[in-house]
Amino acid sequence: MIKTRLSTFFAYLIKNLNNKLYYSLSELTTGLISLLLGFFISTGLSTIPGQTGDWGIIAASLIVAATELTSKIVYSSHKQLNIKINLFNNFKIGITYGLFVDAFKLGS
């Protein structure tokens, strides 16, 4: 095959597209695992303090403080965020979603 500008452009485009897809799928899977781990941890956070009865307010205040601090860090900056901050944000979203699901289960 003759090496033209068009063929080198397409080769470069395919190579970069492969790299982008690989890294984006890697971030997607780790983000999904982090989200599901947060959902799993929320079940423990909602049941363990309920057994003793006196840790409910303290646990709720710690969860709210961590949620607000994470939201402040993630949503205040407009630059590209670190992957660890995104994973922690997904973990926070999983915990919040899990607590809402537990509240709906108790309400029904």
Swiss-Prot record:
Q: Which Pfam families match?
A: DUF565
Instruction: Report the main location listed first in the record.
Output: plastid
List cellular component terms (GO): chloroplast
**Alphabetically ordered keywords of this record:** Chloroplast, Plastid
Q: Where in the cell is it found?
A: Plastid, Chloroplast
* KW Disulfide bond (keyword) present: no
Superkingdom of this protein's organism: Eukaryota
Family the UniProt entry places it in: Belongs to the ycf20 family.
Q: Which PANTHER family match?
A: PTHR33787, YCF20-LIKE PROTEIN
Q: What is this protein called?
A: Uncharacterized protein ycf20
User: Which species does the entry assign this protein to?
Assistant: Pyropia yezoensis (Susabi-nori)
